[in-house]
Amino acid sequence: AVVNELGFDACIDYKAHPDVKSLAKALKEACPDGIDGYFENVGGHLLDAVMLRSNAFARVAMCGMIAGYNGEPIPMTLPQLILTNRMKIEGFIVSEHMEAWPEALKELGTLVATGKLKYKESVAQGIASAPEAFLGLLKGKNHGKQLVKLV
């Protein structure tokens, strides 16, 4: 459903794969030619599986690692792949790019308005639902961006 709805070539529910081996197999089916670029928001065994499927000189933009936010940090188990695949991994903090915000907002707004960019969001109603929404975010219960509508 997500593939057709959002226009993806493939989609993998990482939550349905409890370990690196299972997830790497699913990635191999979805990306038979390997992975050249990846935007990281999850970490944990998802990052390890992506690294196993990464091509030489793959690039990773790290924006978050939510898998380790609600407990002990989850270690990267295959750091040697950064070297052997000559990967470039770079942290990305949106607040360091605020000068690009007006242009990005205009461009992304146009893409959303024309239907060229689609998104998913989970909306909780009322401030009283905020704690549950936040905990759900940490447990991966949301779909897309988690919002709390105050009024």
Positions of the model-derived regions?
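Conserved beta-strand scaffold positions in the cores of enzyme catalytic domains, especially
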Residues: 11, 89-91, 145
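C-terminal capping/lid region of NAD(P)-dependent oxidoreductase domains
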Residues: 116-123, 131-151
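Short conserved AdoMet
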Residues: 32, 55, 142
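Adenosine-nucleotide cofactor-binding segment
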Residues: 1-49, 95
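Glycine-rich phosphate-binding loop and adjacent beta-alpha segment
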Residues: 45-117, 150-151
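A structural signal for short, well-ordered beta-strand elements
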Residues: 16, 123-126
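Well-formed, non-transmembrane alpha-helical positions, independent of function
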Residues: 1-2, 81, 107, 136
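Residue-level signal for the nucleotide or nucleotide-sugar donor/cofactor binding architecture
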Residues: 33, 99, 125
